[in-house]
Amino acid sequence: MQYGMDSFGLRGIPHQVFIKKKEGKIMSLAWWKRELFGGWTHFEAVWLLMFLGIQAVVFVFNPDSWLASVAAVTGILCVVFVGKGKISNYLFGLISVSLYAYVSYTFKLYGEMMLNLLVYVPVQFVGFAMWRKHMALGETAETEEVKAKALTVRQWLLVVAASVVGTSVYIEWLHHLGSALPTLDGVTVVVSIVAQVLMILRYREQWALWIVVNILTISLWAVAWFKNGETSLPLLLMYVMYLCNSVYGYINWTKLVKRHSGQ
């Protein structure tokens, strides 16, 4: 069964969350329970709790960065859920990218700000709509997971060409805007957009690009950390966790491709 989401409003509904599809069906609280807590291996559960625990420790020692910490926690939930092929990743993603856009603005990382505000925010809605049409039962039939697929060699070449052209143009624009790190910022933004498109289209190779993006973004926030102090530390650690998750995401999506090939 596939589910849709027309609203994120949850307050005032004590027993059941009603999120209607066009067909008139609803998404129950029981569905959310299965989606959020079902289908995890022991390793994945420990993996997620470890990531969240690290962010909690950072917040305890650096409470002034609470906004960045919330962005980091919801971002971690988002990418881990993407790695599992869970459609609920888009709820956490919406919260994270909205906050991250504001934090990026305060650090004058305008490329990151525009990427999150103008691309990632609307993409959460587009991605949910695209994924809901291509969901299948998971390995244990306990939860749903997205039907993943793989790029051909020709498609890979097109992805690389588009990334190179887009990066060259965007870096020039960031120079004119006075971005703090136009080259690094520009490469990160363009490759991120391409990776996001591959994610929406359910391609496994998004994770190869996310690995590149996360390495670049770690460099970007490391510079911000040295210049501006501890307020950027939660986001720096968030991208270190993203990098680890990207490797695991590629491995897990390879399994999804094999499991749902031909469907």
UniProtKB/Swiss-Prot annotation:
<comment type="similarity">
    <text>Belongs to the nicotinamide ribonucleoside (NR) uptake permease (TC 4.B.1) family.</text>
</comment>
<feature type="topological domain" description="Cytoplasmic">
    <location>
        <begin position="84"/>
        <end position="86"/>
    </location>
</feature>
<protein>
    <recommendedName>
        <fullName>Nicotinamide riboside transporter PnuC</fullName>
    </recommendedName>
</protein>
<keyword id="KW-1133">Transmembrane helix</keyword>
<keyword id="KW-0997">Cell inner membrane</keyword>
<feature type="topological domain" description="Cytoplasmic">
    <location>
        <begin position="254"/>
        <end position="263"/>
    </location>
</feature>
<dbReference type="GO" id="GO:0005886">
    <property type="term" value="C:plasma membrane"/>
</dbReference>
<feature type="binding site">
    <location>
        <position position="242"/>
    </location>
    <ligand>
        <name>beta-nicotinamide D-riboside</name>
    </ligand>
</feature>
<feature type="topological domain" description="Periplasmic">
    <location>
        <begin position="178"/>
        <end position="180"/>
    </location>
</feature>
<feature type="binding site">
    <location>
        <position position="196"/>
    </location>
    <ligand>
        <name>beta-nicotinamide D-riboside</name>
    </ligand>
</feature>
<keyword id="KW-0472">Membrane</keyword>
<keyword id="KW-0812">Transmembrane</keyword>
<dbReference type="InterPro" id="IPR006419">
    <property type="entry name" value="NMN_transpt_PnuC"/>
</dbReference>
<feature type="topological domain" description="Cytoplasmic">
    <location>
        <begin position="1"/>
        <end position="40"/>
    </location>
</feature>
<feature type="transmembrane region" description="Helical">
    <location>
        <begin position="233"/>
        <end position="253"/>
    </location>
</feature>
<dbReference type="GO" id="GO:0042802">
    <property type="term" value="F:identical protein binding"/>
</dbReference>
<dbReference type="GO" id="GO:0070207">
    <property type="term" value="P:protein homotrimerization"/>
</dbReference>
<feature type="transmembrane region" description="Helical">
    <location>
        <begin position="41"/>
        <end position="61"/>
    </location>
</feature>
<dbReference type="GO" id="GO:0034257">
    <property type="term" value="F:nicotinamide riboside transmembrane transporter activity"/>
</dbReference>
<feature type="topological domain" description="Periplasmic">
    <location>
        <begin position="227"/>
        <end position="232"/>
    </location>
</feature>
<feature type="binding site">
    <location>
        <position position="124"/>
    </location>
    <ligand>
        <name>beta-nicotinamide D-riboside</name>
    </ligand>
</feature>
<keyword id="KW-0520">NAD</keyword>
<feature type="topological domain" description="Periplasmic">
    <location>
        <position position="62"/>
    </location>
</feature>
<feature type="topological domain" description="Cytoplasmic">
    <location>
        <begin position="202"/>
        <end position="205"/>
    </location>
</feature>
<feature type="transmembrane region" description="Helical">
    <location>
        <begin position="206"/>
        <end position="226"/>
    </location>
</feature>
<feature type="transmembrane region" description="Helical">
    <location>
        <begin position="156"/>
        <end position="177"/>
    </location>
</feature>
<feature type="transmembrane region" description="Helical">
    <location>
        <begin position="87"/>
        <end position="107"/>
    </location>
</feature>
<feature type="binding site">
    <location>
        <position position="210"/>
    </location>
    <ligand>
        <name>beta-nicotinamide D-riboside</name>
    </ligand>
</feature>
<keyword id="KW-1003">Cell membrane</keyword>
<feature type="transmembrane region" description="Helical">
    <location>
        <begin position="110"/>
        <end position="131"/>
    </location>
</feature>
<dbReference type="GO" id="GO:0016020">
    <property type="term" value="C:membrane"/>
</dbReference>
<dbReference type="Pfam" id="PF04973">
    <property type="entry name" value="NMN_transporter"/>
</dbReference>
<keyword id="KW-0813">Transport</keyword>
<feature type="transmembrane region" description="Helical">
    <location>
        <begin position="181"/>
        <end position="201"/>
    </location>
</feature>
<feature type="topological domain" description="Periplasmic">
    <location>
        <begin position="108"/>
        <end position="109"/>
    </location>
</feature>
<feature type="transmembrane region" description="Helical">
    <location>
        <begin position="63"/>
        <end position="83"/>
    </location>
</feature>
<feature type="topological domain" description="Cytoplasmic">
    <location>
        <begin position="132"/>
        <end position="155"/>
    </location>
</feature>
<feature type="binding site">
    <location>
        <position position="214"/>
    </location>
    <ligand>
        <name>beta-nicotinamide D-riboside</name>
    </ligand>
</feature>
<comment type="function">
    <text>Required for nicotinamide riboside transport across the inner membrane.</text>
</comment>
<comment type="subunit">
    <text>Homotrimer.</text>
</comment>
